[in-house]
Amino acid sequence: MGDSYQVIVDRDASVDQSEHFGSIVLDWLIAERIVEPEASDCALGLGHRPGPGHLKATAEAPRWFMGQATNGMRIVTGRTVFNGWLDSELRCKQCGAVNSIDGLHDAGENWYEGGQGLLACSTCRFGEAITEWQILPPWGFGNLGFQFWNWPWLRDSFVEDISRLLGHRTVLVPGWI
């Protein structure tokens, strides 16, 4: 069956800022009782289990959710390509053409290694950093992510709250392993 995740990716935090902003959001999540303050092995690594206020983040709370061994929130810092779907669609913002994902992995790897990850549209030849392309389902390129393992779908208002708290653009990236 596998595990699913959703990552709220901060698109604007620098590597140097990621731990600071991660702490701000974690403190808020704990204060709102959305996650438990104690870290445990609940997120395929160290994370925070859902707290009694987790319904502020999700639209529902199925019975199975709280009983899962893997159901925590993990903070990921450092330059990361967050993706969960191999069958993605790349859409050019300039002309709207759907492009093959063939160049996506190379551009993502270039970005991960510190480059811009430039990618040119196969139709209009407009070149742009991979971070600015429209990718569906979304991918996230950033230095900070809040990864929620096996949580029911996160509320749009919750994602917006995180964006406001950070003062940055975010993208919600769904995936599974």
Task: Show the residue positions of the predicted features.
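Long, contiguous alpha-helical scaffold regions
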Residues: Q147-I177
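N-terminal alpha-helical interaction blocks
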Residues: M1-L86
